From Swiss-Prot:
Coiled coil: none
Transit peptide: 1-46
UniProt name for this protein: Ribulose bisphosphate carboxylase small subunit, chloroplastic 2
UniProt keyword Membrane present: no
Molecular function terms from GO: ribulose-bisphosphate carboxylase activity
Miscellaneous remark of the record: The basic functional RuBisCO is composed of a large chain homodimer in a 'head-to-tail' conformation. In form I RuBisCO this homodimer is arranged in a barrel-like tetramer with the small subunits forming a tetrameric 'cap' on each end of the 'barrel'.
Organism listed in the record: Oryza sativa subsp. japonica
Principal location class: plastid
Source organism phylogeny: Eukaryota, Viridiplantae, Streptophyta, Embryophyta, Tracheophyta
Quaternary structure and interacting proteins, as annotated: Heterohexadecamer of 8 large and 8 small subunits.
Record's GO cellular component terms: chloroplast
Assigned keywords, A-Z: Calvin cycle, Carbon dioxide fixation, Chloroplast, Photorespiration, Photosynthesis, Plastid, Transit peptide
Record's subcellular location: Plastid, Chloroplast
Family of the protein in this entry: Belongs to the RuBisCO small chain family.
Amino acid sequence: MAPTVMASSATSVAPFQGLKSTAGLPVSRRSTNSGFGNVSNGGRIKCMQVWPIEGIKKFETLSYLPPLTVEDLLKQIEYLLRSKWVPCLEFSKVGFVYRENHRSPGYYDGRYWTMWKLPMFGCTDATQVLKELEEAKKAYPDAFVRIIGFDNVRQVQLISFIAYKPPGCEESGGN
């Protein structure tokens, strides 16, 4: 017996004709009088400055700002505390990453700083952190001191900024 093949009664689908024009979509419509025309800021901006490539090293989060005043430090620390982060102080004689013994990255290349005491778990007052900063500055006047904010839930460092630069440090711009 020969097998019988039954013709399918399904409807046929039109062949693919290519992508439709998106001109009818609201995203692609452009108004000719939107006011943007040929946008260019190249000729109008004259106040933008470039960070010098020599003489002033860049540090951490707030490197491009002038040195922080005590009021600025208090505001940053209060933000850190409001965000429920744990403040920690770290210090180092060399305030930047360097490699003196090997070409590849390693533990002793300046990425890891020495922690000042323990993280300040439970700290709720920014002035407590400033007191610790003053103690660190007194104990190590020729070291950089940074404040970091640690999230103990996610176990990550979320903010880090230099709070003190040693005097006479020309590559840091002084303090």
